Amino acid sequence: MDGIKYEVFTEKSIRLLENNQYTSNVESGSTRTEIKHWVELFFGVKVIAMNSHRLPGKGIRMGPIMGHTMHYRRMIITLQPGYSILTLIQKRT
């Protein structure tokens, strides 16, 4: 899984698990179709919807120079009813 960096476990993402929606951070250059293909191929599930947004990088000061970390994209993936990604649920508990 080259494009998916890691799963996100926040209050909102845990609440979305009840609606069969999974949240993860992906590479900023990945497209929605690539992520959908990777999820369907790797986990063997059917994706019906995807929402994505870009999160800005944080500012880092190095002496007088202001730099920043890389921005990344967060995807909220909705699966068809009856499908689930068990490895992500087990990792949280």
From Swiss-Prot:
<dbReference type="GO" id="GO:0005840">
    <property type="term" value="C:ribosome"/>
</dbReference>
<comment type="function">
    <text>Binds to 23S rRNA.</text>
</comment>
<comment type="similarity">
    <text>Belongs to the universal ribosomal protein uL23 family.</text>
</comment>
<dbReference type="GO" id="GO:0009507">
    <property type="term" value="C:chloroplast"/>
</dbReference>
<dbReference type="InterPro" id="IPR001014">
    <property type="entry name" value="Ribosomal_uL23_CS"/>
</dbReference>
<keyword id="KW-0687">Ribonucleoprotein</keyword>
<dbReference type="InterPro" id="IPR012677">
    <property type="entry name" value="Nucleotide-bd_a/b_plait_sf"/>
</dbReference>
<dbReference type="GO" id="GO:0003735">
    <property type="term" value="F:structural constituent of ribosome"/>
</dbReference>
<keyword id="KW-0689">Ribosomal protein</keyword>
<comment type="subunit">
    <text>Part of the 50S ribosomal subunit.</text>
</comment>
<dbReference type="GO" id="GO:0006412">
    <property type="term" value="P:translation"/>
</dbReference>
<keyword id="KW-0699">rRNA-binding</keyword>
<keyword id="KW-0934">Plastid</keyword>
<dbReference type="GO" id="GO:1990904">
    <property type="term" value="C:ribonucleoprotein complex"/>
</dbReference>
<keyword id="KW-0694">RNA-binding</keyword>
<dbReference type="Pfam" id="PF00276">
    <property type="entry name" value="Ribosomal_L23"/>
</dbReference>
<keyword id="KW-0150">Chloroplast</keyword>
<dbReference type="InterPro" id="IPR012678">
    <property type="entry name" value="Ribosomal_uL23/eL15/eS24_sf"/>
</dbReference>
<protein>
    <recommendedName>
        <fullName>Large ribosomal subunit protein uL23cz/uL23cy</fullName>
    </recommendedName>
</protein>
<dbReference type="InterPro" id="IPR013025">
    <property type="entry name" value="Ribosomal_uL23-like"/>
</dbReference>
<dbReference type="GO" id="GO:0019843">
    <property type="term" value="F:rRNA binding"/>
</dbReference>
